[in-house]
Design a protein with these regions (language model features):
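Sec/Tat signal peptide C-region and signal peptidase I cleavage site
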Residues: 27-30
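N-terminal secretory signal peptides that target proteins for export/translocation
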Residues: 1-9
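Bacterial N-terminal signal peptides
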Residues: 9-25
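Acidic, serine/threonine-rich low-complexity disordered tracts
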Residues: 32-134, 181-265
Length: 265
């Protein structure tokens, strides 16, 4: 999840939910009726009903030098929403902001359309629901010198259904990837006013050697994230995300997450 590093606004990376610990309440479970987020672009995801945990090893590259900075843990599971709607619940835990960031997203399983999002960071907390083509929520930020948090109500018109930027890599893996595939997809980024269209394109199909999983055949997909263009390596056989890289152009650095959890099957 996706996974824009914390140096870029709120580190659009994260999501996994520990059963009951960070449960999203009844309101966000009001998923809208299934319909594709982008007409003509159908996503498909096979998700096990029980929790599934995937660990990525994160490295940072500056000036051609790599350094390991920790891990990103993604936990996903299927839950039932109102009316029996199947929803995908994802939580991500990773270091950032002088502590640990926990991002949780809830999406319609059939379309991956955003339903709700929560981000718990050392300096602030964000909670959003996506209903009726808008994002409604609260951002709570810590004041100077560890003073009390300040709550700000948020309403952002989105112009229709949208994907959560915290699940960029999952959305990419669920696309009908093939040679020359290209589409423009809308993602939610609160700091950029809500709806952010991003070009997504298959660059190539190739065999790539990964540090833990060895050589695999993958789709190499690019995503035009503003200020942090992403490249995502998706296993052609399992559709698992094997690697995600964000290039932070303004800081001449990149973040790379390599999967270390063995592939299923």
């Amino acid at each position: 999840m996706s996974v824009i590093p914390v140096v870029l606004h709120r580190c659009i990376v994260g999501i996994a939910l520990v059963a009951g610990a960070l449960a999203i309440g009844p309101a966000p479970l009001r998923a809208q009726q299934a319909a594709t987020v982008v007409p003509g672009v159908v996503v498909h995801m096979d998700a096990a009903p029980g929790p599934d945990t995937v660990v990525f090893r994160r490295s940072i590259t500056r000036g051609g030098v790599d350094s390991i900075t920790g891990t990103r843990t993604v936990v996903s599971r299927v839950v039932r929403g109102q009316g029996g709607t199947r929803l995908l619940e994802i939580e991500q835990r990773f270091p950032g902001g002088g502590g640990e960031i926990v991002d949780t997203a809830l999406a319609d399983l059939g379309t991956l359309r955003a339903v709700a999002h929560r981000s718990h960071q050392p300096a602030k907390t964000m909670r959003f629901e996506f209903v009726g083509g808008a994002a409604e929520g609260i951002v709570s930020a810590r004041g100077p010198a560890d003073s009390a948090r300040r709550d700000e109500a948020v309403h952002q018109d989105l112009g229709g259904p949208i994907f959560d930027s915290n699940v960029i890599e999952l959305v990419v893996a669920a696309l009908p990837l093939k040679a020359e595939f290209a589409a423009e997809l809308p993602f939610f980024i609160y700091e950029r006013g809500g709806r952010v269209p991003m070009p997504v394109a298959v660059r190539e199909r190739a065999r790539v050697a990964f540090p833990v999983l060895g050589e695999r055949e993958v789709w190499v997909v690019t995503v035009g994230v503003p200020g942090a263009p992403a490249t995502i390596w998706v296993d052609t056989a399992t559709r698992a995300v094997l690697r995600t890289r964000y290039d932070i152009t303004a800081r001449a650095m990149s973040f790379t997450d390599d999967r270390v959890t063995p592939l299923h099957g």
